[in-house]
């Protein structure tokens, strides 16, 4: 394969899906473009709790990348990225193959923070990558056992509600308060749903390690014994970014300008969870919204035109699945719950999939 490109898209996150969708509608830049992804499908994170709750089938929650790429006249390259040389720029794949490009866009996502583990008495299941999570969750369901979940954010709360009734017991561990970054009303609603679902909630318990079949907190105490742990902690950058030469923030994410352009390498763009932009929290809402700006800027940069800026909204709508086909909603300091919100969330999720996954 000729490994030289005019533009490479690394990763198939929500921003790049939106870019491909726009290009499929006829706004594609000139030149040879490729997309690199470790998997042939992109999973839509908003539908993962519904998939766990068996409200959806796997095929309803994933987007076939070869088909979407073909519609956008983009070459699909299946491979795992292990290194980046931004000065060239070049991408190194796990196979040893090197891809070169004039322009590079990174939408790599993030991974949950994992506690240190000693011994093999407990299986750890990270919520990302989604393909691995779904495959192993389905294996666990063949012989259900009690489960602990690490993570007091939306992902942890939604998964606990989705898993309720499908395993004998669930323990949800939060380093601080549940949904600490969300309105108090939403937190109260979520606590009520979790308690009614018999989820045992452990707030202000910071789990630091796994020893055998036990969870150990930062106080040195044992907080749970069991064999299965789901990790839905906050976003952690990919390890190899530290050695990439890109300018990173203090947490290891790629610093970008409001144009989603690397602060250190003007021919590199980044969006979604892997990028660090003041005011843009790491959630799917911003990743989806960044797609339009990114698509425009990738076209403009190649021909030397001024770039657009992405302006994060002060407040983002949050819709959390309640495991019973309803949803919890928050906007600014407002919060609500109900079946109608669940229908609305389902409509939005299915619309996203139609826009990105049903190309002839």
Where are these regions (language model features)?
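FAD-binding core/adjacent interface of flavoenzyme oxidoreductases
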Residues: 2-4, 8-10, 71-146, 219, ...
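Beta1-alpha1 glycine-rich phosphate/pyrophosphate-binding loop at the start
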Residues: 2-74, 158-184
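Short glycine-rich anion-binding loops that position phosphate/pyrophosphate groups of nucleotides
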Residues: 15, 109-112, 235-237, 325
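A Rossmann-like FAD-binding core segment of flavoenzymes
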Residues: 76-84, 91, 99, 167-258
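FAD-site-proximal beta/loop scaffold in flavoenzymes
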Residues: 122-144, 224-227, 232-292, 296
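Rossmann-like NAD(P)H-binding beta-loop-alpha module
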Residues: 136-173
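Internal hydrophobic alpha-helix adjacent to the cofactor/substrate pocket in enzyme cavities
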Residues: 286-313, 319
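C-terminal auxiliary extensions adjacent to catalytic cores
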Residues: 324-360
């Amino acid at each position: 394969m000729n490994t030289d490109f005019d533009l490479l898209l690394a990763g198939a996150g929500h921003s790049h899906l939106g870019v491909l969708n726009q290009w499929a509608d006829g706004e594609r830049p000139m030149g040879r473009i490729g997309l690199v992804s470790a998997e042939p499908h992109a999973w839509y994170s908003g539908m993962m709790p519904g998939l766990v709750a068996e409200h959806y089938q796997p095929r309803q929650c994933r987007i076939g990348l070869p088909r979407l790429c073909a519609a956008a006249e983009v070459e699909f390259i299946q491979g795992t990225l292990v290194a980046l040389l931004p000065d060239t720029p070049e991408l190194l794949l796990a196979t040893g193959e090197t891809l070169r490009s004039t322009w590079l866009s990174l939408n790599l996502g993030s991974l949950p923070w994992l506690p240190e583990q000693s011994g093999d008495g407990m299986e750890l299941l990270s919520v990302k990558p989604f393909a691995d999570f779904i495959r192993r969750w389905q294996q666990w369901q063949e012989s259900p056992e009690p489960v602990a979940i690490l993570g007091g954010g939306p992902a942890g709360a939604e998964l606990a509600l989705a898993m309720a009734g499908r395993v004998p017991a669930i323990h949800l561990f939060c380093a601080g308060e549940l949904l600490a970054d969300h309105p108090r009303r939403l937190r109260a609603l979520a606590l009520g749903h979790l308690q009614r679902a018999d989820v045992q909630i452990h707030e202000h318990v910071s789990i630091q390690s796994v020893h055998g079949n036990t969870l150990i907190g930062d106080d040195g105490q044992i907080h749970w014994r069991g064999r299965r742990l789901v990790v839905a902690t906050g976003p952690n950058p990919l390890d190899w970014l530290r050695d990439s030469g890109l300018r990173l923030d203090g947490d290891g994410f790629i610093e970008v300008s409001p144009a989603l352009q690397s602060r250190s390498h003007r021919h590199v763009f980044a969006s979604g969870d892997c990028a660090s932009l003041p005011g843009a929290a790491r959630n799917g809402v911003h990743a989806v919204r960044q797609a339009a700006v990114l698509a425009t800027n990738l076209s403009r940069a190649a021909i030397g035109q001024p770039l657009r800026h992405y302006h994060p909204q002060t407040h983002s709508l949050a819709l959390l699945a309640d495991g019973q086909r309803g949803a919890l909603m928050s906007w600014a300091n407002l919060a609500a719950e109900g079946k109608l919100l669940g229908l609305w969330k389902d409509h939005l999720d299915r619309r996203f999939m139609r826009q990105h996954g049903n190309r002839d």
